[in-house]
Every structure is written in structure tokens, then in C-alpha cells.
Amino acid sequence: MNKYEIVIMLDPAENIEKAQSLLKSTFKSGVEKFEKLEFTKLAYEINKSKVAQYVLAIVNSQGKEEINEFVRKANITKTFWRHMIINLTSEKGINKPAKPKKTFKKTFVARKFSRDDESKTHSTEEPRRANTKSTYKKSTSFSQDNKNKK
């Protein structure tokens, strides 16, 4: 016997007794918990409504046939806007405390340098761009051509 959690989004004008009677008629093993949740403002309109009411139910089911029958009936009913079914028995990690994350701790290793090592690390080479001045020479042919035209 599997335990399922069902959340149904209903039309705000709908009576929740209809949802409860549908659950009781579909699941022969019984409904463990039936709870009406608060009205919730929706992120977008569904059937020209900006609010919806939610129903939470925990049911016991003997097989997939009951779940399939509930989905079929919920899809037929126009006032059931959305539904979500979660299998609590096969859900891994439910009702378990969260595992602490493993943290990697870096250890600081002090290096030993002597003055001899320090002098070897400094390079005596010139920098790659030793001369930053432009080596471009002005063309004198252009200026001479202008003088000849005058």
C-alpha cells in the first residue's frame, strides 16, 4: 500500500466538499488527511480569476489504478484547475534531516626562503617593451609636394 500526497487547486467559488467526496469515492483505502489551505493570489489568471483555493490530501492507495482514476476524474471536472500527486513511500530523502555539506579546508604551508633564493628569482633582463617611443619617421615627400604646388 502506497501513501500519496495530493494538492488540488480549485476554483475559489467551488465548495471543497466536492473535492473531498471525489477523493473518498476514488480511494477505497481511505483519506488519511484532508486540509483546506488558504486562498492564494495567483501569478497569472486562470479562467479569468486571480485567486484560487488549495486542498491538501494524504491518501493510501493499493495500486496505480486508483491514481489513474483520480487523474481522469480531476481532468473531467472543470472546477479542478490543477493537481499534483507525490508518492511519499518512494520519495527518497523525505522525513530525513539534511546532510551537512562537506567543506574542503585549505591548509597554509609556509615556505622558507633565504636571501640567496630571493636574488635568483629576480630577472636582470630588460622589460619586453624597452622603448615605448614611436619610431615612425615623418614623410618629407608629402610636405615637399605641397611646397612645389604653391
Curated annotation (Swiss-Prot):
Chain segments carrying region Disordered: 92-150
Keywords: Ribonucleoprotein, Ribosomal protein, RNA-binding, rRNA-binding
SUPFAM superfamilies noted in UniProt: Ribosomal protein S6
Keyword rRNA-binding in annotation: yes
Claim: Ribosomal protein is one of the keywords in the record: yes
Cellular component annotations (GO), alphabetically ordered: ribonucleoprotein complex; ribosome
One Pfam family matching this protein: Ribosomal_S6
Gene3D superfamilies: 3.30.70.60
InterPro entries membership: Ribosomal_bS6, Ribosomal_bS6_sf, Ribosomal_S6_plastid/chlpt, Transl_elong_EF1B/ribsomal_bS6
Biased composition (Basic residues): 98-109
A molecular function (GO) term: rRNA binding
Family of the protein in this entry: Belongs to the bacterial ribosomal protein bS6 family.
Designated name of the protein: Small ribosomal subunit protein bS6
Gene assigned in the entry: rpsF
